[in-house]
Regions:
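Vicinal oxygen chelate
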Residues: 5-13, 47-50, 69-94
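Core segments of cupin and vicinal oxygen chelate
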Residues: 2, 10-55, 93-102, 107-116
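Short amphipathic alpha-helical segments, especially helix-boundary/capping motifs
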Residues: 21-23, 67-71
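Short, conserved turn/kink motifs that form compact alpha/beta structural patches or helix kinks used as
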Residues: 61-66
Length: 116
């Protein structure tokens, strides 16, 4: 049912500090990181770190109603927030997972790549 790993979402208190960590500690060149962009409809600011065969999405809260704030309250240094796999039909995949007992936290929505 699942396809290729598209990206791993990592909630962070500061995208710029996280980028510095990926650059200085892990050796990721600055050219492999995108500029930060705001997604106000989801209450997040995001940037991507491009690594071989995938991406890491850095997610910072945007505004005081950001769902990422709750995550960071429990995990102040940040951490893995989600894993994104590509599927042919998101609704079919969701329904199949629910039928097998999976908990689905919300409806599919347009993400940072502009896709469901």
């Amino acid at each position: 049912m699942i396809g290729r790993l598209n990206h791993v979402g990592v909630a962070v208190p500061s995208i710029e500090e996280a980028k510095a960590t990926y650059r200085d500690l892990y050796g990721v060149p600055a050219s492999a990181m995108t500029e930060s962009r705001d997604m106000p409809e989801q209450g997040v600011r995001f940037a991507f770190v491009n690594v071989d065969n995938s991406q890491i999405e850095l997610i910072e809260p945007l505004g005081d109603k950001s769902p990422i704030l709750n995550f960071l309250e429990k995990n102040p240094k940040g951490g893995q927030h989600h894993v994104c796999f590509e599927v042919k039909d998101i609704y079919e995949a969701r329904d199949a997972m629910k039928a097998k007992g999976a908990t689905v936290l919300g409806e599919p929505r347009i993400g940072a790549h502009g896709t469901l």
